[in-house]
Amino acid sequence: YLGFGKLVFYLMTLQFSMVMTEQTLAAVPLFVFMGIMMEQAGLMERLFSAFQMMLAKVKGSLYYAVLFVSVIFAAATGIVGASVTILGIMAAKSMNRSGYDVKLAAGTITAGGTLGILIPPSIMLVVMGPIMEIPVIDLFAAAILPGILLASLYAAYTTIRCMINPKLGPVLPDDMRAASMKEVWIEFFLGLVPPAALVFAALGSILFGFATPTEAAGCGAMGALLLSLAYKKLTLSKLQEALVKTLEITALIMVLVAASNFFGAVFARLGTPTLLTEFLLGLEMNKYLILAMIMVMIFLLGWPLEWVPIVMIIIPIILPLVEALGFNLTWFAILVAVNLQTAWLSPPVALSAYFLKGVVPEWDLKDIYYGMMQFMVLQVIGLVLIIIFPKIALWLPTLLYGQ
C-alpha cells in the first residue's frame, strides 16, 4: 500500500462518500446554474447602463454603478471570475471614454467582483457550513452586513478620492447621457426588479426558515431559467453551454472538496489539530494575538491557494484551537471569508487581476495591481472592524434566530 495502511484507503472512500452525499452541498450546482443563467439573461448590462445614465452628472458615477451592480449580482452569481470579467467588459470601455483613472477603475471593478465570495448565497459559505458544523442559514445571515460594510467602504473611498481630485472620475460626456429619463427608469426597473426579486426570494426563504439552502437553490435555478426565457435570451445552445459550465465548475469544486476533506481527515487522525491546540494554548498568549496569527496565516495561504483547500484542510486543523479559545464560530467563519476575499486582491497571485487583464488588455497589469492594493487596504480595515465589533457579523443571526 505504498507505505499506507489499508485503513487509509477505507478512510478515503468514506470521506469521498460523505462529501458526495452531503445534502447541503447539493445547493452548489444549483446556485452555480442560477448565476450562469442570470448572467446570460443580460440583466447585468441593462442595470449598469441604466444606473450610469441616472448618475451621468455625478462625479465618479461609473464607480458607483460598478459597485451597485456588483452587490446585486454578487448575490446572484457568487462566482468571482465571472463577476470581474463581466464588470470589466461592461465598465472599462465607458471608463476609458470618460477619462477615468485606470488604477482606481481597476481597483473598483476587481474589488466589486470579489464580493461574490462573501455576499449570500456564497458557494464558499455553503461549503464552509458543514465543515465547521454551522447551519448555512447562520452564515448567510452573518455575511450580509459585512458585505454591505465592505461595499460602503469602497464607495466612501471612491467618493473621497473624486472629491480631492475630480479628474479621477469626471462627469459623463453628453453623448453618454440619456435623451429621456423615462427610458432610463424603465431600463433600471427591468434590470433591477426581476433579478433582485429572485435573489431576495431565494435568500429570504433561507433566512426566514421557509426552505433549506438546497430547496431555495433549486427554486432560484428554476426562476433564473424562467427569467432568461422571459427576456428572450434562452436558446438551446445557451442552455447547453450553461449546463456544461455548471458541470465543469461543480465537478471541480466537489472533487477539490472531497480530496481536501480526505487530506484533512488524515491530518486529524495523526493528531495534528490536538498538537497544535495544546502547543499554542501552552504558550499562554493573548487569544486575540493567536487570532491575529491565524488571520495572517490564512491571508498568506490565500496568495498561492484557492479557497477550497484552505477551507477544507486548514480550517479543520485550527478549528479545535478556535473553539478552545472561546471564539464564536459563526463570527470566525465570516472573518475567514473576508480574509479569503482579501487574498483575491493581493498581488502577486491575485487572480482578479488576470481576469480583468484578459478582457481589458489595454490596461497595464502594473496599474491593475496598484488599484487592487488600494482596495486590499480597505479590506483589511473592514476585517479589523469586524474583529473589534463582532456584532457586525452576529447582530442579524442573533436577531433572526436568537443565538
Could you tell me what each predicted segment is?
Residues 1-403:
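Alpha-helical transmembrane segments of multi-pass membrane transport proteins
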